[in-house]
Amino acid sequence: MKEKYGYGGWINLDHHKTGCARMMKDEHFFREVESNCWDPGVRMNECDDHGVDVQVLSTVPVMFNYWAKPDDALDISKILNNHIAAIVVEFPKQFTGLGTIPLQEPEKAIMELQRCIHELDLVGVQIGSNVNGTNLSDESLFSVFEAAADLGAAIFIHPWDIMGKEEMEKYWLPWLVGMPAETSRAICSMIFGGVFERLPNLRVAFAHGGGSFPATAGRIQQGYDVRPDLCAIDNQVNPKNYLGKFWVDSLVHDGDALDFLIKKIGADKIALGSDYPFPLGELEPGKLIESMDYPDEQKDKLLFQNAMDWLGLPSNYFS
């Protein structure tokens, strides 16, 4: 990539042995990955082993490339999106896909979003929780959300570029503490920024059970009540009104947390999440949901139907 674009910072795979690769950022090691990150055959075998019928494919967030020159980010987005779309075309009963778009330049992001929906037949896009430090409430990004709503495209928001990560490198804290906070940052930005208010038909899902947002929703509400001069400057609607207006995934790792999430967000707005194939995911997707004492109808929603509603697909789409 450095040779192609003339500067560094890109993620490359170093296939140092069969079935394994190092994700490298220039000469710096980022993480080790296995062939289930790039080989659809391996993915389908592992899905069969764990009872997963359909996966929604998306780009690894570190490859959003919002830091890059916009034209280059658009180019690499096209490469990534074409790859995902090709897998979906080859295996339409096993996969659907989300694209990635160069949000550092909204006009180019909208162009690629339109291509994802109209030409590649993807169902939406995955984006980060911020864009080079800019919150998702920023007016420059509203046109992207507006285009997604008009296109009927689903949006999945995953934490990335974690705030404060340099100050908490030890103990894996960026993943354990920073990511939940980043997700809450994204939700609050879209609530207080009026994105959901202005675009009521926008279908957005947030990763990792909405991060720290559900547990701090009361604190956020209190902030709105006591300091509207700080919280309600762009949207005067009570933040609690938006509970149940967006989706979160089910990846909370704990039965009590899942019960709370259902109570706070709603049983119709929680979709099965796996974080596959990474270590903070659920190795056997749906195992927690299946273990809970919920009615079968509710389990069906959590395991399947809610995701289809968020994606905007009919229930029999993969039949």
Region spans (language model):
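Helix-coil boundary/capping segments in enzymes
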Residues: 1-319
